[in-house]
Design a protein with these regions (language model features):
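PRPP-associated nucleotide enzymes
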Residues: 1-186
Length: 186
């Protein structure tokens, strides 16, 4: 058989389908179910199956808190059990997810060059000197990526820190008290 590549974008909510006369948008679960159907349809007929997933299914939730499921880890294990040998993704939220399938090829392509190239092409008026530009990381999880950007651009790095009031609960959540920049003042 031939090598088969499946492209599945679980974050694409623009696709719709009609269900009992109502237009529904495809959820990540719908995309993942369709991917499994396609894999089942060609299983045993291909030499090697690879899945290209720009954003991993369930990949934003990378650690278990209390009794939550780890959808991404389970999905990767399911795909491996179905015969998928390669997963290709872009900028995984937490690349440690590959530990769920240590015997399967897992390529995490970092699009940092493409991001900088597109930024410069579409905003040529930007000045990357320390007096006019700063890279801000939205949270601790993105700090390594933004450290790379600030190093390449030769500018300062800041980070949002979400200070929460843990004494109050609003709709089951702790409200954010303030956003503060850590690092040089902005």
């Amino acid at each position: 058989g031939d090598d088969i590549f499946f492209i599945c974008d679980p974050g694409n909510y623009s696709l719709t389908y009609n269900l009992f006369g109502v237009e529904n948008h495809m959820s990540p679960d719908d995309h993942y179910a369709n991917l499994k159907r396609l894999i089942q349809a060609v299983a045993g007929r291909s030499h090697r199956m690879s899945v290209i997933m720009p954003s991993l299914y369930g990949g934003r939730q990378h650690r278990r808190v209390v009794r939550e499921s780890l959808d991404c880890a389970v999905a990767l294990q399911e795909l491996q059990a179905m015969g998928v040998q390669n997963i290709i993704t872009f900028d995984a939220h937490d690349p440690r997810l590959m530990n769920a399938v240590p015997l399967m090829s897992f390529d995490n392509v970092m699009p940092t060059y493409q991001v900088l190239k597109t930024l410069l092409q579409h905003m040529p008026e930007l000045s990357f000197d320390k007096d006019h530009f700063i890279v801000i990381s939205p949270d601790e999880g993105a700090i390594s990526r933004n450290m790379y950007f600030s190093s390449v651009l030769g500018c300062n790095l800041g980070m949002f820190y979400k200070r929460r009031d843990y004494t109050r609960v609003v709709n089951g959540r702790n409200p954010i008290v303030a956003h503060e920049y850590l690092g040089e003042s902005v």
